[in-house]
Amino acid sequence: MTDQPPSKDLIWSIGIYGGKSPFDLHPLPDVSNPILTCRDVTSTPAKFVADPFMIQADGTWYLFFEVLNQQTNKGEIGLATSETGHNWVYDQIVLTEPFHLSYPYVFEWNGEYYMTPETLVANGVRLYKATDFPTQWSSLGSLITGSCADPSVFQYDDRWWMFTCSTPYQHDTLRLYVADEIMGEWREHPASPIVEGNKRKARPAGRVLVLGDTIVRFTQDCVPNYGTQLRAFEISELTSRTYVEKENPSSPVLSASGHGWNALGMHHADAHLMKDEQWLACVDGSREVSLQRDHNHDARAAHIKA
């Protein structure tokens, strides 16, 4: 979630959903959402938690997420763990920088763990590698430079690809980059920008899924406000020269509930296929809070530009 000027007082929390497909996600009967809030963060005075990504290693689930530090007003990357993927325990802050961090897109490649968090304030996309997974991370350098919100990296057809929003305060332009090697030369795709001037389908909203010949990207629908709901697009053709996508008929796949922890919006999903052929996803949601309530407890205000 991009560091933005204040205009609306929201609080973001993290939940767990499941379903028979990544387009059919819903609350699970044995999960009490939200599974993680700012009150669970014991090592940092947190305003909110958001942008969750999870990965399983050696039988344990690891959840990485943005923690907005109330004292510095900068994002840091937090960690929680779970044996089942349903019940989570906060662990610690695992990555801080002098600038704002969010959207900790974590992935495994060749037996090593990497992360491309949003490093917009540092004018680019940085790649981090775990030197001692899951708690120690080191920067390997920048993949691309410029205004890049919510960078989403994935492998397909022996290449690396990256979606990112280049208008982080308007949420209306989606760009696509491609590289032969992750630390190699990244070039903008000929079809990029994929989306321009449309707040409903430009800003990335979680892990890109590669399902055989079909690629699924989740996107924020920022109408009427930032982070209102999630849409899903299926990419049926992706080459070094061409790009074809269509919206999944189930869109929007996640929306505001109208009450509780996700009353006002949902803007993120990281979905994983489980052994029982069901999907498990970490998601986030927002609700408005009163400025008169105790900001040191569950009413810590988060300032997000609508």
Which residues does each PLM region occupy?
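Carbohydrate-active catalytic/glycan-binding domains of CAZyme proteins
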Residues: 1-306
